[in-house]
């Protein structure tokens, strides 16, 4: 990969420019970063991975402004029905189990190996999400289908606070 060549994935920036201007500094929104990007695996394939003991997975369910997380594996009846709103399934390391997702990860090989972990794939019903949280690492978010509102917090104090109600954090919206 020529790290000095501009990439549509990075809004026309080269990997060198991206790493200097944005990596660990500020977010970059790139609409249509991958032309005609579609889901690389079906919902059923994702659910099958979530049922495996060899794959890290978790569900996040929202009930009355409270978020509950459960770790997988998830058998056929251990996830809510897809018709139920307010829940999400997260499956870690999908690139190790699906060749198409592995190929997707190769587009990010400009990131040093020590900072490039894996591909997590999620499925969410309407109203589903992961709840207020912060990541202690940099994240590339690719949305293959559906609609989602993404927010990036301006919060500087990252101390966890027990009992804080959902929606009180000051966030700037990125859609």
Name each region found by the language model:
Residues 1-21, 35-172:
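Active-site region of the double-stranded beta-helix
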